[in-house]
């Protein structure tokens, strides 16, 4: 399974409520996406600083998204999809910045 995690920051000019609505629209647009096994998006509700190890300040993060793909082949199907291209265009509207991470399953 390939999983890509995205830290998302809304545009400065967008309200929190509008960002929330666009996250829902983006989730709805993911239905039936070729090659995409699963998509999740979660709004950041808080940012605790009482950690048991040194705190890493990465700035404001408004949401976390995650895309799942069953295989490299399915990821390529996704990347070549015209539907995915339209999905990315929507992302340009409501995502001001993002930081992606391809994760490796450990256990």
From Swiss-Prot:
| Catalytic site positions | 26 (proton donor/acceptor)
Instruction: Look up the coiled coil feature and give its residue ranges.
Output: none
SUPFAM superfamilies in UniProt = Dimeric alpha+beta barrel
Per UniProt, the keywords (alphabetical) are: Isomerase
Q: Where does 4-methylmuconolactone bind?
A: 26, 39
Impact noted for substituting residue 39 to F = 5-fold decrease in catalytic efficiency
Q: Does the keyword DNA damage apply?
A: no
Q: Which InterPro entries match?
A: Dimeric_a/b-barrel, MeMu_Me-Isoase
Presence of keyword Isomerase: yes
User: Which catalysed reactions does the entry list for this protein?
Assistant: 4-methylmuconolactone = 3-methylmuconolactone
Q: What is its EC number?
A: 5.4.99.14
As for family, the record states: Belongs to the MmlI family.
Q: What does this protein do?
A: Isomerase involved in the degradation of 4-methylsalicylate and 5-methylsalicylate. Catalyzes the isomerization of the dead-end metabolite 4-methylmuconolactone (4-ML) to 3-methylmuconolactone (3-ML), which can then be further degraded through a modified 3-oxoadipate pathway. Can also use 1-methylbislactone but not 3-methyl-cis,cis-muconate.
The name under which this protein is listed is 4-carboxymethyl-4-methylbutenolide mutase
* Organism field: Pseudomonas reinekei
Q: What gene makes this protein?
A: mmlI
């Amino acid at each position: 399974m390939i999983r890509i995690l995205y830290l998302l920051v809304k545009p400065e000019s967008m309200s929190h409520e509008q960002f929330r609505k666009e996250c829902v629209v983006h989730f709805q647009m993911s239905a039936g996406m070729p090659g995409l096994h699963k998509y999740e998006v979660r709004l950041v509700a808080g940012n605790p600083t009482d950690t048991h190890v040194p705190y890493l300040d990465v700035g404001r993060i408004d949401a976390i998204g995650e895309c799942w793909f069953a295989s490299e082949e399915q990821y390529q199907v996704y990347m070549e999809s015209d539907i995915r291209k339209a999905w990315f265009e929507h992302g340009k509207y409501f995502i001001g910045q993002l930081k992606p991470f391809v994760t490796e399953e450990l256990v």
